[in-house]
Swiss-Prot record:
Record bears the keyword Ribosomal protein: no
Lineage: Bacteria, Bacillati, Bacillota, Bacilli, Bacillales
Catalysed reactions, as listed in the record: ATP + H2O = ADP + phosphate + H(+)
Sequence ranges assigned to domain Helicase ATP-binding in this UniProt record: 33-203
Region: Disordered, residue numbers: 440-509
Protein name according to UniProt: DEAD-box ATP-dependent RNA helicase CshA
Subunit structure: Oligomerizes, may be a member of the RNA degradosome.
Similarity comment: Belongs to the DEAD box helicase family. CshA subfamily.
Annotated keywords: ATP-binding, Cytoplasm, Helicase, Hydrolase, Nucleotide-binding, RNA-binding, Stress response
Length: 509
């Protein structure tokens, strides 16, 4: 394996990288760095988490050291990714007088203009704000020799394809080296490459990265009305360190977040209507382990680069393979194992098969946890929580009350009563989620109404007996629709058979 020095990186940068713990380049870095140093255009197909920031950032530092004015522009789909890229570049260039600045929306543009006047060598920004500065002429392009597009397909998905064209057209082509990195290569990105890049060197690590055995992929067949209970049962059994949960709509994210909070889980939500300040606050909590469940839409989660995510749950199945790829790519990073679970209605199985066919690998069928598994997991969780409480120093007032209670009651009965109160406080909370009709079968239309479903945990049971439903005018239509989906479920009986006898624990052996 080549080291960074053998790839042509200077001693100063190599020392910095070694101090950061980077002794050997990743595959994408090994293949990209020599071409980047030569000034060749690069088309890299790789996911976030494969070391691609180093693939373009390390050689970029070598090129801008000692230069004056803006030398490079890096485009990123989101503010968070722009900040992460900028921070990593600052780490790579420690002690080398390289200035890196970020420009993105949601922050005062006047402050950014002031920083740009100082002539930083590297500017990292989102397309919209970069265009604002280009139109104001506060971002000078005449000295830019390197343009980098990070997660180009994400920018395209967010509607920035015309913005990317505009920006690429503004930077002089004769002196421009262009590096474009993307997890997928849709037609619009291919057209961008043909129009603006000069005989790019193609670096493709996707096949290996996407097939990474570090991510165990599962699907579980579940009806819409049972989905929330099944999901919380999985949470209790899996006990994820950090989990990202994907919902299809903003409403779904809001309702899921509220439902999880009401059940005692530490969760926050992200979607397009969340303010920038709130978004940064939520991400900070997630990274600092103040919350362990992040509920998000596809758009809100784009560009996130958070280490330590152990589980990804697709509460709503994604509508296309690209979205699925980006979702599960949030886990299984840096050599750590990850788990991705997709909840699928029986009539949505065509989408699972499509994902499997495109990615050329099969997901494992996973049946929902048994009641005994859930209860055991909750008992273990209670014991862990009590153990943590016992390590804290108690207030004298509470110790006095405790002594008085122990004189009056049996200690075992007293503890059991307190624990029962603790458990039932969350179990008795009734949760309401708006019914989301399943995705239509491929080449077929799907009918469905808008209704609401009530979910209640009910002391670990996840059957229908503990579910209370409120009367409403639409109750008769709800029964008709349920019969319709039940008939469809029977048609998919063969799919359900594959789940028999298979548990999450079975797949871990």
């Amino acid at each position: 394996m080549q080291n960074f020095k053998e790839l042509g990186i200077s001693d100063k940068t190599v020392q910095t990288l070694e101090a950061m713990g980077f002794k050997e380049p990743t595959p994408i870095q090994k293949d990209s760095i020599p071409y980047a140093l030569e000034g060749d255009d690069i088309l890299g197909q790789a996911q976030t988490g494969t070391g691609k920031t180093g693939a373009f950032g390390i050689p970029l530092i070598e090129k801008v050291v000692g230069q004056q004015g803006v030398q490079s522009l890096i485009l990123a789909p989101t503010r968070e990714l722009a900040m992460q890229v900028a921070e990593q570049l600052r780490e790579f260039s420690k002690g080398q007088k390289v200035q890196v600045v970020t420009v993105f929306g949601g922050m005062p543009i006047e402050r950014q203009i002031k920083v740009l006047k100082r002539g930083p060598q590297i500017v990292v920004g989102t397309p919209g704000r970069v265009i604002d500065h280009l139109n104001r002429r506060t971002l000078k392009t005449q000295g830019i020799h390197t343009l980098i597009l990070d997660e180009a397909d994400e920018m395209m998905n967010m509607g920035f394809i015309d913005d990317m064209r505009f920006i690429m057209d503004k930077i002089p082509a004769e002196q421009r080296q262009t590096m474009l990195f993307s997890a997928t290569m849709p037609k619009a990105i291919q057209e961008l490459v043909q129009q603006f890049m000069k005989a790019p060197k193609i670096i493709k690590t996707m096949n290996n990265e996407m097939s990474d055995p570090q991510i165990d992929e599962y699907y579980t067949i579940v009806k819409e009305l049972e989905k929330f209970d099944t999901f919380t049962n999985f949470l209790d059994v899996h006990q994820p360190e950090l989990a990202i949960v994907f919902g299809r709509t903003k409403r779904r994210v809001d309702e899921l977040t509220s439902a999880l909070l009401s059940k005692g889980y530490k969760a926050e939500g992200l979607h397009g209507d969340i303010t920038q300040a709130k978004r940064l606050e939520v991400l900070k909590k997630f990274k600092n382990d103040q919350i362990d469940i992040l509920v998000a839409t596809d758009v809100a989660a784009r560009g996130l680069d958070i280490s330590g995510v152990s589980h990804v749950y697709n509460f709503d199945i994604p509508q296309d393979t690209e979205s699925y790829t980006h979702r599960i790519g949030r886990t299984g990073r840096a050599g750590k194992e990850g788990i991705a679970v997709t909840f699928v209605n029986p009539i949505e199985m065509d989408y699972i098969r499509q994902i499997e066919d495109v990615n050329n690998r099969r997901m494992k069928a996973l049946r929902p946890p048994h009641r005994k598994e859930v209860l055991k997991a909750r008992e273990d969780d209670i014991k862990d929580r009590v153990q943590n409480w016992m390590s804290r120093e108690n207030e004298p007032r509470l110790q006095r009350i405790s002594s008085e209670l122990l004189k009056e009651y049996d200690s075992t009965e007293l503890v059991a009563s307190l624990l029962q109160e603790l458990v039932e406080a969350n179990d008795e909370v009734e949760v309401q989620l708006t019914f989301e009709k399943p995705l239509a079968r491929k080449n077929r239309s799907s009918k469905g109404g808008s209704r609401r479903s009530n979910h209640k945990r009910g002391n670990g049971k996840f059957d229908n007996k503990n579910r209370r439903s409120k009367g409403s005018k639409g109750q008769s239509s709800k029964k008709k629709n349920q019969k319709k989906f039940d008939r469809r479920d029977k048609q998919q009986k063969s799919g359900n058979q594959s789940l028999k006898g298979r548990t999450f624990a079975d797949h871990q052996k």
